[in-house]
């Protein structure tokens, strides 16, 4: 019974070893010893051929097979070395698949030297554990992959990054002036007669719109300003004309002559009258309710002659008085 169990365990271990070397070998003879020897020889041959050709998928860790595994005898109660190797292969195969999934998400190693198969011979005595050997191989492979990845890493580009930093210019250069919106003062143009009459054949233009409206009433005949005096139905086109007419009813004469006591109700009548005086000057007349400073009037010629005679007589008296003394 123990021999049958040992044979089944050995066959399972053989299957694991063959699966790890990717060799399809399913030969089982009647004699377990002969079968084990044939399997070991076939496994060694296939693995050597694959190692010589250098085949193997990139990115997957290749695990070297355990060669020349001794066949357990029916008398021995435990096939510890062979079963330990099989269990190590099973654990490492699971670990290799997990590592491959992690490496597929990250950047793969650039160099292929980290996956080259290496040959080694297991101890015949079976006292040294095989699992420690595979752990050392895995650690060496990972370290070689990391070193090659660091060596093959691209150098940092010397181009300036987009971090927002402004490269420094020459020491004597000044920063460029800001190109913001510049406000210019509006040029003051001289006043022009922009308000032109729109009636056909009339080319008159005015500075103010109110003047244009009063002028257009001459074309339309409109007279919106009417006198409200009793029994007076006169109408006017301008308000100043109405005010002038209203003074005829009240008898107000606010424009007085500066050279005589006469008064007038209209400023043009006053100007016409003042020009008749020989000593008249335009600054003497009130202008829009304000009297301008009049020029000093020259004395009349009779007064000048009399003052000259008085001074000459007084000087003669003084000379005679001094002569008498």
UniProtKB/Swiss-Prot annotation:
Biased composition (Low complexity): 306-316
Gene (name only): Klf14
Gene Ontology terms for molecular function: chromatin binding; DNA binding; sequence-specific double-stranded DNA binding; zinc ion binding
Family annotation (Pfam families): zf-C2H2
Coiled-coil stretches: none
Residues spanning the signal sequence: none
Entry protein name: Krueppel-like factor 14
GO biological process: positive regulation of sphingolipid mediated signaling pathway; positive regulation of transcription by RNA polymerase II
Record region (Disordered): 153-196, 270-325
Zinc finger (C2H2-type): 195-224, 225-254, 255-282
Annotated organism of origin: Mus musculus
Location of this chain's protein in the cell: Nucleus
Membrane-traversing stretches: none
GO annotations of cellular component type: nucleus
């Amino acid at each position: 019974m123990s021999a049958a169990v040992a044979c089944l365990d050995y066959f399972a271990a053989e299957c694991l070893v063959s699966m790890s070397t990717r060799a399809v070998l399913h030969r089982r003879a009647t004699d377990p010893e002969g079968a084990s020897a044939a399997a070991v020889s076939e496994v060694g041959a296939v693995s050597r051929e694959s190692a010589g050709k250098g085949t193997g998928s990139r990115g997957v860790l290749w695990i070297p097979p355990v060669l020349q595994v001794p066949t357990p005898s029916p008398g021995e109660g435990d096939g510890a070395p062979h079963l330990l190797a099989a269990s190590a292969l099973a654990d490492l195969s699971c670990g290799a698949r997990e590592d491959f999934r992690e490496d597929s998400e990250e950047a793969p190693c650039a160099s292929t030297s980290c996956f080259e198969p290496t040959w080694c011979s297991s101890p015949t005595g079976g006292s040294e554990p095989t699992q420690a050997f595979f752990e050392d191989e895995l650690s060496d492979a990972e370290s070689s992959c990391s070193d090659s990845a660091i060596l093959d890493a691209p150098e940092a580009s010397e181009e300036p990054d987009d971090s927002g930093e402004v490269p420094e210019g020459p020491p004597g250069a000044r920063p460029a002036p800001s190109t913001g919106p510049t406000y210019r003062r509006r040029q003051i143009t001289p006043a022009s007669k922009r308000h032109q009459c729109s009636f056909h054949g009339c080319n008159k233009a005015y500075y103010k719109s109110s003047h244009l409206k009063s002028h257009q009433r001459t074309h339309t005949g409109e007279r919106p300003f009417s006198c409200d005096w009793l029994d007076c139905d006169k109408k006017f086109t301008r308000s100043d004309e109405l005010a002038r007419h209203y003074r005829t009813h009240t008898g107000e004469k606010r424009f007085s002559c500066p050279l005589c006591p006469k008064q007038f109700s209209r400023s043009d009548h006053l100007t016409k009258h003042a020009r008749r005086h020989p000593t008249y000057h335009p600054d003497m007349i009130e202008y829009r309710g304000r009297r301008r400073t009049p020029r000093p009037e020259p004395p009349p010629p009779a007064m000048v002659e009399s003052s000259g005679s008085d001074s000459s007589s007084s000087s003669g008296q003084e000379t005679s008085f001094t002569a008498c003394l």
